[in-house]
Design a protein with these regions (language model features):
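Conserved catalytic cores of phosphodiester-cleaving nucleases, focusing on short active-site segments
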Residues: 46-69
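Hydrophobic, Leu/Ile/Phe/Ala-enriched alpha-helical segments that form helix-helix packing faces
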Residues: 23-32, 50, 86-93
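Short acidic/glycine-enriched loop/turn segments that link adjacent beta-strands
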Residues: 40-44, 107-109
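N-terminal targeting/trafficking signals and adjacent low-complexity tails
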Residues: 6, 65, 72-74, 95-100, ...
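Nucleic-acid nuclease catalytic cores
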Residues: 88-119
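Acidic-basic catalytic patches of nuclease active cores, encompassing PD-(D/E)XK
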Residues: 1-40
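Mg2+/Mn2+-dependent nuclease catalytic core
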Residues: 66-89
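Intrinsically disordered, low-complexity terminal regions enriched in charged/polar residues
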Residues: 110-160
Length: 160
């Protein structure tokens, strides 16, 4: 039974990474052009370098981990998928170093990147920032995490 459970978990994690890869590619295909270098995606990291359409700086985006947390608010389970990314501009004068969180909001087709150093990730703080919703993500559909934080706190945001 244990191996069966592990197999299910492993399969789910593999699916999560595949979905993460797909979303990252879709999101940044619109915002970033000329993918200069891409390394193979693995279960531990996903790394590629791309240049923006509006400037020549190159960004290295490394997905450190993908994990899911569950928060309960007003009887609804909000499924939160976080893509932790270390983003660093190759131009030292403009560098932005640190750990960032990429929040995907399929319901509203929005994405946000937050600087984790500027946001308290404890449950209470996250719940205070959530916009109330009346629908929650189906646990079988990894593509439907529902979370919205104030866009004014986002480093970068956009639609897809």
């Amino acid at each position: 039974m244990s191996s069966s459970i592990n197999s299910v978990i492993e399969t789910q994690e593999t699916n999560d990474y595949a979905i993460g890869k797909h979303i990252i590619e879709r999101l940044f295909k619109d915002k970033l052009s000329n993918i200069v270098k891409r390394e193979a995606y693995s279960a531990t990291d996903m790394l590629f370098t791309a240049s923006t359409k509006t400037r020549e700086s190159h960004y290295s985006i490394e997905i450190k981990s993908i994990y899911k947390d569950y928060y309960k608010e007003e009887g609804f389970i909000l499924k939160v998928s976080k893509w932790l990314a270390a983003i660093q501009d190759s131009d030292a004068r403009d560098s932005t170093e640190g750990v960032f969180a990429l929040y995907i909001v399929p319901k509203y087709r929005r994405w946000y990147i937050y600087n984790l150093r500027q946001i308290n990730l404890n449950t209470a703080h996250l719940q205070n920032k959530m916009i109330k919703v009346t629908q929650y993500a189906d646990t079988q559909k990894v593509l439907t995490p529902i979370i919205l934080l104030y866009t004014s706190e986002a480093v970068v945001s956009g639609a897809y």
